[in-house]
């Protein structure tokens, strides 16, 4: 387990993100929607996406504190399809405030892909074990059955009715001891794509 996460000061709300996976999905959405809508799609607004995930996870307006943990491969210095994007210089240790409260960002590099697969579920285990955490939003690589099943197993062992846990994926997945939300909606909002614009082109 990465020492950086072991020493983390947890917040009442936590968003745990496989950042490499979300970046890849965002690239696919940009390519597909540029073709469909016939216009350039700008990089996704990271703060807007985080807000949308928080809302989908049940957070409402107020003076909340939310920790956003971006897990990424060590050889990836930045998100390619979001702004701001540089893990070390623009994201790690930074924060922003809006109507949903304060969001604290922690970017955690992982050495190898195999380590990353298990690291994500280990990070999730650590998060669900924290008594002070009331709300957890999880964005794993749900397209990988191994990773998704590890996430499900971890969450199905959580014996805390006070925790509201939401897992985000691009399509509905086998359920468990958690709520589910579709990841694509928050990413579309962050990319400035509305359902009305899609309807007008179909």
What role is predicted for each listed range?
Residues 97-202:
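Nuclease catalytic cores that cleave nucleic-acid phosphodiester bonds
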């Amino acid at each position: 387990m990465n020492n950086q996460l072991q020493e983390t000061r947890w917040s009442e709300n936590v968003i745990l993100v496989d950042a490499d996976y979300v970046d890849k999905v965002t690239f696919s959405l940009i390519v597909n929607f540029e073709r469909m809508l016939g216009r350039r799609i700008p990089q996704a607004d990271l703060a807007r996406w985080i807000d949308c995930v928080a809302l989908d996870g049940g957070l409402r307006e107020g003076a909340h504190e939310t920790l956003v943990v971006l897990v990424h491969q060590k050889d990836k210095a930045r998100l390619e399809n979001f702004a701001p994007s540089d893990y070390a210089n623009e994201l790690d240790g930074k924060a922003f405030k809006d109507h949903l409260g304060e969001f604290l960002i922690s970017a955690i590099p992982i050495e190898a892909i195999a380590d990353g697969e298990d690291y994500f579920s280990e990070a999730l285990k650590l998060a669900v074990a924290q008594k002070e955490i009331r709300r957890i939003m999880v964005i794993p690589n749900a397209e990988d059955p191994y990773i998704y099943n590890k996430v499900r197993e971890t969450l199905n062992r959580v014996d805390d009715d006070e925790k509201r846990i939401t897992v985000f994926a691009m399509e509905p997945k086998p359920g468990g001891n958690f709520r589910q939300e579709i990841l694509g909606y928050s990413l579309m909002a962050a990319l400035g794509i509305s359902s009305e614009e899609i309807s007008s082109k179909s």
